[in-house]
Amino acid sequence: MAVSKNEAQSRIQINKMLELSGWDLDIDSEKRNVEVEYPTPSGREADYVLLDKNGFPLCVLEAKNFEIDPLIAKEQARDYANELNCRFIILSNGREHYFWDIETGNPNTIS
């Protein structure tokens, strides 16, 4: 799926956030644990999927552009998480970030 200019700018911020948090997005790295545009069984693509130490999906990260409240992607991200058997979701527009454990409640703001 094509990414808008604003969403691309948001993704730059999200990439920085992930790297500062210890996640590896380098496609040439053997330690890479983040996949971008990760295919789901239904044929759709999750913006990002964070992988566990065994390479299995752990968390779906849905990216939106700066101008959009990331919470609008809540149901879309839940669909991806369910398809990929992920318990955790991050919703972000590069400025606002929410963490959601779909087994225990609603998204919470993170910084």
Segments and roles (model prediction):
Residues M1-S111:
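Accessory nucleic-acid engagement/destabilization modules that flank
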